[in-house]
Amino acid sequence: MKFNVSSTTLFAQLQSVSRVIASKNNKLPILDSILFDLQGQTLTLSASDEETTIRTSMEVENAEGAGKVAFDAKLLLGTLREFPEQPLTFTIDEQNFGLNITSANGTYSFIGANGNEFPEMPEIAGDNHFEIAESTLLNAINKTLFCAADDELRQVMNGLFFDLTPEQFTLVATDAHRLVRYTNATAHTEAPASFILPKKPALLLKNVLDKNDEQVNVVFGQKNARFTFGTTTIVCRLIDGRYPNYNGVIPQNNQNKVIIDRQMLINACKRVAVFAHTGTSLLKLTLSANQLNISAQDISFYTSAEETLSCSYEGAPMSIGFKAPFLIELLNNIDSNEVMLELADPARAGLILPMENAENENLLMLLMPLLLQD
């Protein structure tokens, strides 16, 4: 087999598919490789870690022959990473799976493996499906993925919960301390359906999706889901189990409401958090008439800080504690200039809502409080 290809174009495609390859793979050595499948003038690249498989296609020039050969991903990426933009010639010996890469100034050779030993992409057993714009799915993942748990005992919390109805698409993530619920009315299924997407394929989607309005076709069953967009297909194994009733933990009818500039709040929290106890990172928020006081202290080192910010506040005077990194990270993942904090009492979860949502979108963030000692 033989073909010509742009060095930078091929490198970009190899980078995309290589993200799925496991850092340690003891079961199938061929999964350290990227599969090259040449058919006509189309080169298809595939990579897998057994649970997630990604496949993408690109056009090449002057192709001769056809077949499948797998090549070590580190060797490929290490070689192509240093090339400036230039045409490369790939010559593959189908008998011993040897590869010669010819550039303007040199030749690079190594041995691959029989592509027929590479695992096939799993078929999806199920007819649940929906379509969603790439930009919408990317935004949904960006707004939720950071909040997914890393919990060996509760595997269902380690992914993103796709909850679909005939009216809307909802994406949820929680680590039991924080919860994010993203809803969009532009995607839906014919009947209620749901699945839990693991973090690794979610991160892969985050890295390969574009900010455009091209549609992503999603098909899912009991065990696997398939995402198809442009020339790329991702198939992944789903997390088995029942996701917690996320709507049941969202407090309703919160009487105390704060409206405040988001960036001003972030900056103040960052400054005051420097003085918080290193073990708890506790920030105390004290609310009174149109004022928010943020304070922290570490009595072990005799340090303390406080700032008072102007805000719009409806409710009774109250104080509540939050873990500084969690509060700051939630605020950083909101786009609106202003946010609303809805609070009930110091022992119940607080809600953080953007004052402005994009069309057809709704975002809700929940943060569990920390106990105040005084």
What kind of region is each of these model predictions?
Residues M1-D374:
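Structural preference for solvent-exposed beta-strand-turn elements
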